[in-house]
Amino acid sequence: MKKGIICVALSILNIVLLCACGAGRFSAENSLPELVIGGAEYAPYFYTDTDEYTGIDVELATEACRRMGYRPVFVSLDLENRAKALSNGSVDCLWTCLTMDGREDEYTWAGPYLYTRRVYVVPQDSAIQSAEDLAGKKVSVQAGSTSEELMLEGQVEALNKVDTFAVYQSLGEVFMALRRGYVDAMIGHEGALKIYTEQYPGEYRYLAMDLIRSRLGVAFRKGENEELAAQLTQTLQEMTEDGTTAQILEQYGLDVEQNLYGGTE
């Protein structure tokens, strides 16, 4: 009987200790300073899965914050409103597949941590073979994206001859416009567009050229959090060197050479 009582007592003690340890970890995590991170629904970088945020940027941010001693708090933003959310203090930084190129003086940057390509996609049987063939055609892009900025600013000569740019709120709508034949081509981030085109093997084709290659960074308000940005840059570099970033990219099916090191021209 005594042995039974002792076993029960030890079991209860173990449960109490385990609960105490769990509570301690929970308390320690909550005591960490928060880093409020603004993202945008943009698979495979930032999206919702079973009511939780996930994606490449989310995993990179979570690991970087763990190493730096911060607790990440993710907030979903519209692409068009992300700059406003940062400037008014709603978020501490933008970690949302954000292109650094052309914006170097607009923010305090951490990174670059990845590279990206903006590409042209057409139906497999389309006669379009180059950007020049888009003259007089209809092209879909996402509102607030780098692709839309390039179109509005007239930076790419071939795009100046496009007849109509159809601008949609989400990348899913950009793709559906092409699938339903409303437009002749779509332009966007290669990694994000593949989420859609790979659902229909052999039906879509990427033109053998890039619209633009650019660097991705984490944006803080201009002139603020410079030490934090520098620390984050160092942490992201360490994650590249120890293979963490490559492992995350492979998990989401992206080419490591292209996305981590910029590929080749």
Summary of predicted features, one role per range:
Residues 18-26, 146-168, 205-206, 237-265:
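Ligand-binding clefts/hinges and TM-proximal coupling segments of bilobed small-molecule sensing domains
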Residues 26-97, 167, 231, 251:
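Extracytoplasmic small-molecule ligand-binding "clamshell" domains
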Residues 36, 40-44, 53-63, 98, ...:
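Bilobed "Venus flytrap"/periplasmic-binding protein-like clamshell domains
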Residues 40-41, 115-122, 190, 194-237, ...:
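Periplasmic-binding protein-like
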Residues 1-34, 265:
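Short, low-complexity disordered leader/linker segments with a strong preference
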Residues 62, 66, 71-133, 205-210:
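Acidic, polar ligand-binding/catalytic clefts
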